[in-house]
Amino acid sequence: MKDTNNISKLDSVVLLKSIPSKKVRRGDVGCVVEVHKPDIYEIEFVDENGNTKALVTLPGSDVMRLNLNIAATT
């Protein structure tokens, strides 16, 4: 199975559907901490203090990779 999302370990992703049992909502941003196989990801969601609020395994259809182009300032 080809990974059509091009999601890699440490990518930022946005959740496309709420998961009430895990206390994460559509629009929450998480970080991919592991790629188990193509299109299956372990994603960590943190609170405003940086504490883990959820660690969930999701298919690629439930998330979208964020393209964060942060320019360095001097």
Stretch-by-stretch model annotation:
Residues 2-3, 9-74:
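Basic/aromatic-rich interaction segments and small domains that mediate binding to polyanionic partners
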